[in-house]
Swiss-Prot record:
Belongs to the neurexin family. May play a role in the correct development and proper functioning of the peripheral and central nervous system and be involved in cell adhesion and intercellular communication. The gene is CNTNAP5. Residues 23-1236 are extracellular. Coiled coil: none annotated. Residues 546-583, 957-995 form the EGF-like domain. This is Contactin-associated protein-like 5. It comes from Gallus gallus (Chicken). Residues 584-790 form the Fibrinogen C-terminal domain. SMART domains: EGF, FA58C, LamG. Residues 1-22 form the signal peptide. Pfam families: EGF (PF00008), F5_F8_type_C (PF00754), Laminin_G_2 (PF02210). GO terms for cellular component: membrane.
């Protein structure tokens, strides 16, 4: 068994030992109240003496049959003194016998002293117990976790509407025995070992403590080699410092420090358990556990001489301590099974004590809690007209702002205000006709810790002291003398209070106060509670009900938690997540999702598990027409040379993908297909074949498994691709490299078994022989397809559904999916618990509802749509619930957000199966399609489950009805089983969404001519019923669009001529204006000039010319520049279209001829004529399209040239495929630097020169042959996947040598 496993077993056994050690009595269910004397019962008030609390024993009929208070309100309570600290495991209640008085709900509070009460909580929420429904039945409650206390209070919350509060009670439990030590802040216990050194591999320390201050050392031990362990309170939190010293201490940092807990200075008991086995440590404070491993190499803890508890004594200096000592009580202190306090009580010689006693002495401090931000206040009387003022108190809060004190000073000396603003303390004295006096002190006083405040004034001088630090006290001087006030308002002012005795320039205080002194006299807050001193509103007296809402931290994915008194906030900056609790990823889950948003190829972050624990991963998304590829790069994708590696000294390379193994696994599992190229170039270096069967090279994949097959082969077969194809150089072997030849060869192929990918390491062992050399290359991880994005199911009956395991989402739940339907209503999904549930449904054609109940009653978030959602289109739904809010998003409609209550139940407890498309009752089922269903980032495979479920079919057709609008510029949406694609055949653009421009650089002599099908017969009286094959040539309309960029005028942009010597020309005249010129046989020359500026200005311009019948519209740069109606036009029988220079001898008017002389120099993009894209045809289909190119034509991006001089733009555009694969039989010269590489380079240059000479000769021969080509043509059969527009227009010659395309090198 490995070390981590041993550690886990050891810690588990330690936990069982600890449980056995601390258990006091397994039969802990005895009745504790029935034998108590009458004096053990007290209450807030009593209706009559016959209704006193002494009659509140269960099943008793004495007096009036139970306790009832004077007034029935939430300030009443019944208190029981159980005589000693006991363990309480249950309670029971009854109403007042024979009456209409009973309590329907209540809370419990407990205390050791009858002061400083604590409310019983469950899941950090004050637990509300269900009471009675009549006067005599008994309602029992067994506590989820027991309480150890002497005093117990029942606090009624609600009671019978037709009666009053009435109560009889019983408490169940048993005696509780413990060993307690009281530390006064100046003492400690020392536990000395029997030997000089205590060396341990396993330690278990357990204790309970109650602290009177926020700092102090609980225990400490250290050794001479640097080992130490320290547990101490720091600002109300518990810190464990541990160092397992080793010999390399000076070279490594083995110190480990972990902090846990909060508000531990509240004078209540807190439990601690520390379990260590070697480096593995479990640190538990109350219910919160943190698991961690210590740093360094050592496994054992060496402590010299002794352990100290309560402080760290300085050797040789009795009574002197290194850090602040602990002030409070420690109970049941065990160190590795030794009861330290018991040894001390029995005065064992190994225990040395300071001023330590063995009972817990606690000060009778009464805190109060200001509950409301608007109504809470405490009014206490002062001693008026005293010369001077003295007020002091302590406070703690999470709120940055709040009024602490307001009073009107006597003798017209003004008003005194003390308040928090932005976490800083401000004291303000203001008086009419005098400048206000202001003092500001402190920062971050809303940190939840106790802060003391002391205000002293004498005559004209006032002093403000914060946290008893006299050295930093602030002083101010007033014009008038200061006299003590009559009334002091703490925390706020009464409602509608306009008297100047209480002023509040800020919100009311929410927090706790204690130790209030006015005029140097302490104020008894119990008298306030009894109504005999001052006044108050919305206070909890005798308890500080502060709660750390950031413990545990419910901000996910590393979000930073901050809080106020009523809620918490999450800072999601630098987390890659968003939302109220940083739950939702800001990135998509796959490249497929980015494509769905209309994105094009680029680097993106993807978050494969969405809101799950895995972080985002940077990938390259290659979004093409047919597949969407995801590429994950690693640290070494180039060709790498290897020499000198043998079995004793192998060559090893590990790959870093800048991601975790879990992230890569999620990407691979989500994809339909994955691959990695593996190339091994070898010269006398074998790959797989060895005499004993152990290969010379191998690779390591997922799960750290060693694999013995190479690229192009299959798992379990120790072969290369050529072995499967039976094409190896030497047929005796299964790899080319295994032939062990002196010349370079290679074995290259794809590794495509997903369960083995990615490649994490490669090992090579055969390059240490004479003249032996190898070079390897492992390409990036490539995957395509998102198995979930189009994963869908069709629900055909209302009774059909899919069921999945229970959805576990106690504190955070997000549900997202797409749906389409024609039904009026139906439940998308439902999961039930005993009382809790979660449901998403379409209630009406325009209404989606998300319903949830976590125990506080149902909550519904509803989104109303202005248009019906049952339109058989895909719609997106995202429902989310966290501790702060419940929300529902439908498509891009406004999100519906409901804030969660600050208190109450918050854990969603579900236990039934998850029903998708229906309910457990088989009613209100959904009819339609659901796809891409995610729950908390996890993907549910609807298709696989639908294959085995009657009434449900896998998949759902009809994606183009929703996503067809993503195909732009004339592209057509094509349905696919798992999605859709855009067919850009009928578009001048290309790309996955037909949005990418097709553009090229023209020089003065560049000419592109597109030849249309010749009409038959060539006559203007040709029947309109001629074959459809002539439709393009005889049409009587123009739909022209193109973009251009140039710095030259005049220029000929576009020329269209007919078989009847008519033409249409688009030119730039000498002054840069745009002209559209029609030459018609009837009307002669018609000229339309757009003279709105110089269009030869090195900027991109977009031109659209539309003529339908007699109406002509010319639009430039999205603005209609001209409209014209022809009297008559008959522009048909199109012969050809030319971009740039017209090279044939054609009749041109002088202006067109002049422009043609200059041709066109610049960039032209996305040219469209009716349904023909001549520029795209020239660049993409030169061998099959009826297009001729003359001069230099270089594909380029016009937008990239806008800042460049088009006269000198000569950079050739290269559209490199990031997934391009090279099929080389030798290593790349830039990777393998050897003499053979240099020779190869020289040979390549010579070959290149020879090809250039051949190309030039071919050009002249081709031009000569073109001049004498036959005018007769023969129709050719085209491939089926060719664009349909080309099939009708292409006119090819009989042989390839007679193609109309002209090439230039």
């Amino acid at each position: 068994m490995d070390s981590p496993a041993l550690g886990a077993v050891a810690l588990l056994l330690a936990g069982f030992w600890h449980l056995g050690l601390t258990a006091t009595n397994y039969n802990c269910d005895g009745a504790l109240v029935s034998t108590l004397p009458s004096s053990a019962f007290t209450s807030s008030s009593e209706f009559f003496s016959t209704h006193s609390p002494s009659f509140a024993k269960l099943n008793r009929r004495d007096g009036a049959g139970g306790w009832s208070p004077l007034d029935s309100n939430e300030q009443q309570w019944l208190q029981v003194d159980l005589g000693d600290r006991v363990e309480i495991v249950g309670v029971a209640t009854q109403g007042r016998y024979g009456s209409s008085d009973w309590v329907t709900s209540y809370t419990l509070m407990f205390s050791d002293t009858g002061r400083n009460w604590k409310q019983y909580r469950k899941d950090d929420t004050v637990w509300v117990f269900t009471g009675n429904s009549n006067a005599d039945s008994v309602v029992h409650h067994k506590l989820l976790h027991s309480m150890k206390a002497r005093f117990l209070r029942f606090v009624p919350l609600k009671w019978n509407v037709g009666g009053h509060i009435g109560l009889r009670v019983e408490v169940f439990g048993c005696s509780y025995k413990s060993d307690i030590a009281d530390f006064d802040g100046r003492s400690s216990l020392l536990y000395r070992f029997n030997q000089k050194l205590m060396s341990t591999f396993k330690d278990v320390v357990s204790l309970k403590f109650k602290s009177m201050q926020e700092d102090g050392v609980l225990f400490h031990g250290e050794g001479q080699r640097g080992d130490y362990i320290t547990l101490e309170l720091q600002k109300g939190k518990l810190s464990l410092h541990i160092n397992l010293g080793d010999s390399n201490l000076h070279f490594t940092n083995s110190h480990t420090s972990v902090t846990l807990g909060s508000l531990l200075d509240d004078q209540h008991w807190h439990s601690v358990l520390i379990e260590r086995f070697n480096k593995q440590v479990n640190f538990t404070v109350d219910k919160h556990t943190q698991h961690f491993r210590t740093k360094g190499d050592s496994d054992h803890l060496d402590i010299d001489y002794e352990l100290s508890f309560g402080g760290i004594p300085v050797p040789g200096k009795p009574g002197t301590f290194q850090r602040k000592n602990f002030h409070g009580c420690i109970e049941n202190l065990y160190y590795n099974g030794v009861n330290i306090i018991d040894l001390a009580k029995r005065r064992k010689p190994q225990i040395y004590t300071g001023n330590v006693t063995f009972s817990c002495s606690e000060p009778q401090i009464v805190p109060i809690t200001f509950v409301s931000s608007s109504r809470s206040y405490l009014l206490l009387p002062g001693t008026p007209q005293i010369d001077g003022l003295s007020v002091s108190f302590q406070f703690r809060t999470w709120n940055k702002d709040g009024l602490l004190l307001s009073t009107e000073l006597s003798e017209n000396s003004g008003s005194l205000l003390v308040y928090l603003h932005g976490g800083r303390l401000t004291l303000l004295i203001q008086k009419v006709a005098e400048d206000p006096v202001e003092i500001s002190e402190g920062t971050n006083l809303h940190d939840g810790l106790w802060h003391s405040l002391n205000i002293n004034a004498r005559r004209h001088r006032i002093t403000l002291t914060l946290d008893n630090n006299a050295a930093t006290a602030s002083h101010a001087t007033t014009v008038s003398r200061i006299y003590s006030g009559n009334s002091y308002y703490f925390g706020g002012c009464p409602d509608n209070f306009t008297d100047s005795q209480c002023l509040n320039p800020i919100t009311a205080f929410q927090g706790c106060m204690r130790l209030i002194f006015i005029d140097n006299q302490p104020k008894d807050l119990i008298l306030v509670q009894q109504g005999s001193l001052g006044n108050f509103s919305d206070l909890h007296i005798d308890l500080c009900d502060i709660k750390d809402r950031c413990l545990p931290n419910y901000c996910e994915h590393g979000g930073k938690c901050s809080q106020s008194w009523t809620t918490f906030y999450c800072d999601c900056n630098d987390t890659s997540y968003m939302g109220a609790t940083c739950h939702n990823s800001i990135y998509e889950q796959s490249c497929e999702a980015y494509r769905h948003q209309g994105k094009t190829s680029d680097f993106f972050y993807i978050d494969s598990d969405g809101s799950g624990p895995l972080g985002p991963l940077r990938v390259f998304c290659n979004i093409t027409e047919d597949k969407i590829w995801t590429a994950v790069q690693h640290n070494n994708t180039g060709l790498t040379r290897v020499q000198g590696a043998g079995p004793e000294k192998p060559y090893t390379m590990s790959f870093n993908y800048n991601s975790s193994a879990e992230q890569l696994e999620a990407v691979i599992n989500s994809a339909e297909y994955c691959e990695q190229e593996a190339a091994y170039h070898c010269k006398k270096s074998r790959l797989l074949n060895t005499p004993n069967g152990i290969p010379f090279a191998w690779w390591v994949g997922r799960a750290n498994e060693k694999h013995l097959y190479w690229g192009g082969s299959l798992p379990g077969i120790q072969q290369c691709a050529c072995g499967l194809e039976e094409s190896c150089l030497d047929m005796r072997y299964f790899c080319n490299c295994d032939a062990d030849r002196e010349e370079w060869t290679n074995d290259t192929g794809l590794l495509a078994f997903k369960d083995h990918l990615p490649v994490t390491q490669i090992v090579i062992t055969d390059t240490n022989r004479s003249n032996s050399e190898a070079a390897w290359k492992i390409g990036p991880l490539h995957c395509y397809g998102d198995r979930q994005f189009w994963n869908a199911a069709s629900f055909n009956t209302e009774a059909s559904y899919l069921h999945f395991p229970t959805f576990h989402a106690e504190v955070s739940a997000d549900i997202s999916f797409f749906f389409k339907t024609t039904s009026l209503s139906g439940v998308f999904l439902e999961n039930l618990g005993m009382k809790d549930f979660i449901r998403v449904e379409i209630r009406s054609p325009k209404e989606i509802t998300f319903s949830i109940d976590v125990g506080n009653g149902p909550t519904e978030a509803t989104v109303q749509s202005p248009t019906p959602l049952n339109d058989n289109q895909w719609h997106y739904v995202r429902a989310e619930r966290n501790l702060k809010q419940t929300s529902l998003q439908v498509d891009n409609l406004p999100k519906k957000v409901l804030e969660a209550p600050a208190e109450g139940h918050f854990r969603l407890q579900l236990n039934s199966q998850l029903f998708v498309g229906g309910t457990a009752s088989r009613q209100k089922g959904f009819l339609g399609c659901i796809r891409s269903l995610h729950l908390n980032g996890q993907k549910l495979d609807l298709e696989e489950r639908a294959k085995m479920t009657p009434g449900v079919k896998p998949g759902c057709p009809g994606h183009c009805s929703s996503y067809g609008n993503l195909c732009h510029n004339g592209g057509k949406c094509v349905e696919k089983y798992n999605g859709y694609s855009c067919d850009c055949t009928s578009s001048a653009y290309e790309g996955p969404f037909c949005k990418e421009e097709v553009s090229a650089l023209f020089e003065a002599g560049t000419s592109i001519t597109y030849i249309f099908q010749e009409p038959y017969p060539v006559t203007k009286n040709a029947s309109t019923s001629s074959s459809a094959i002539y439709a393009d040539a005889i049409t009587s309309k123009e739909n022209i669009a193109f973009s251009f960029l140039t710095a030259h005028a005049p220029s000929l942009l576009l020329y269209i001529n007919t078989y009847f010597h008519e033409y249409l020309a688009v030119i730039l005249s000498k002054n840069g204006s745009l002209q559209v010129r029609y030459k018609l046989s009837k009307d002669g020359l018609l000229i339309f000039t757009i003279d709105s500026g110089n269009f030869a200005n090195r900027e991109m311009h977009h031109v659209k010319i539309n003529r339908e019948g007699r109406e002509l519209i010319i639009q430039v740069d999205q603005v209609i520049k001209l409209k014209h109606n022809f009297s008559e036009i008959d522009f048909k029988a199109i012969k050809s279209l030319t971009l740039g220079k017209v090279t044939d001898s054609l009749p041109l008017d002088p202006e067109v001829s002049k422009a043609n002389a200059y041709g066109f120099t610049g960039c032209m993009s996305s040219v469209w004529y009716n349904h023909v894209a001549p520029l795209k045809a020239a660049l993409r289909h030169p061998s099959i399209a009826p297009v001729t190119v003359k001069g230099s034509l270089t594909e380029s991006s016009c937008s990239s040239l806008m800042e460049t001089d088009v006269n000198t733009a000569t950079t050739i555009y290269s559209s490199s495929d990031p997934f391009g694969k090279t099929d080389e039989r030798e290593p790349l010269t830039n990777a393998v630097r050897s003499d053979s590489a240099v020779i190869g380079g020289v040979i390549a240059v010579v070959i290149f020169i020879i090809f250039c000479i051949i190309a030039i000769m071919s050009r002249f021969l081709y031009q000569h042959k073109q001049a004498h080509r036959s005018s007769q043509t023969k129709e050719k059969e085209y491939p089926e996947n060719l664009e349909s527009s080309f099939k009708a227009d292409i006119d090819l010659q009989n042989t390839v040598s007679e193609c109309k395309r002209e090439y230039f090198i």
